[in-house]
């Protein structure tokens, strides 16, 4: 049974947001509201059938974000760099500004560390560095926020980097290369982490979970 706390999930039809929405729904403790540009999509309909409230909205429209956040206790947000590229920062800033204007009690924001800063300027990873810039902006607003930094998705081996069958019948992965170590996560499990944060937000305030 829910405790009437409404959590808005941004990006609920994507890999991260979908897992978060499903875990929140399965916990039975929250009312889950999912923002999507296309409420009639197959994934949006599946979320609605699972018990979520699905609303139409767009990162590019600040007012639509604020409308979706009305009455919400918390927000989970992620901005997909690979979908938005050079608009990622602008759209992410819209999201953060909407949270700041909406009396949200706790914000969970999926970001990434600053590769350029960590490497002393030797390495630039655009999708990391833009997300880190969004995190820096968010910290400056004094919000009740927790940052989550998910690792490489194991699910990528089922899509972007599938194993290739060799002549001897075995399968080989082409990534990572050589002896390189690769941290990974089943992205569905991120939902469990985010649900735990919303269950005990004071324990995770201003923290970064990697």
Segments predicted by a language model, with ranges:
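Cofactor-binding loops of NAD(P)H-dependent oxidoreductases
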Residues: 57
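Oxidoreductase cofactor-interface core, primarily capturing Rossmann-like NAD(P)-dependent enzymes
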Residues: 2-46, 60-70, 79-90, 98-106, ...
């Amino acid at each position: 049974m829910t405790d009437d706390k409404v959590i808005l999930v941004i990006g609920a039809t994507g890999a991260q947001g979908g897992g978060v929405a499903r875990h929140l729904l399965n916990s039975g403790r929250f009312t889950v509201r999912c923002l999507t540009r296309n409420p009639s999509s197959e994934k949006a309909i599946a979320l609605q059938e699972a018990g979520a409230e699905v609303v139409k909205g767009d990162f590019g429209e600040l007012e639509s974000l604020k409308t979706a956040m009305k009455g919400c206790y918390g927000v989970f947000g992620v901005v997909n760099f690979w979908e938005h590229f050079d608009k990622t920062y602008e759209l992410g800033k819209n999201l953060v500004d909407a949270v700041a204007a909406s009396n949200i009690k706790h914000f969970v924001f999926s970001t990434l560390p600053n590769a350029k800063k960590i490497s002393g300027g030797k390495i630039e990873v655009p999708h990391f560095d833009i997300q880190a810039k969004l995190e820096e902006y968010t910290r400056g607003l004094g919000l009740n926020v927790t940052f989550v930094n998910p690792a490489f998705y194991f699910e990528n081996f089922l899509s972007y980097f599938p194993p290739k069958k060799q002549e001897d019948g075995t399968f080989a992965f082409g990534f990572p290369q050589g002896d390189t170590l690769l941290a990974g996560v089943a992205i569905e499990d991120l939902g469990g982490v985010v649900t735990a944060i919303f269950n005990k937000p004071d324990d995770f305030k201003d923290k970064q979970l990697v």
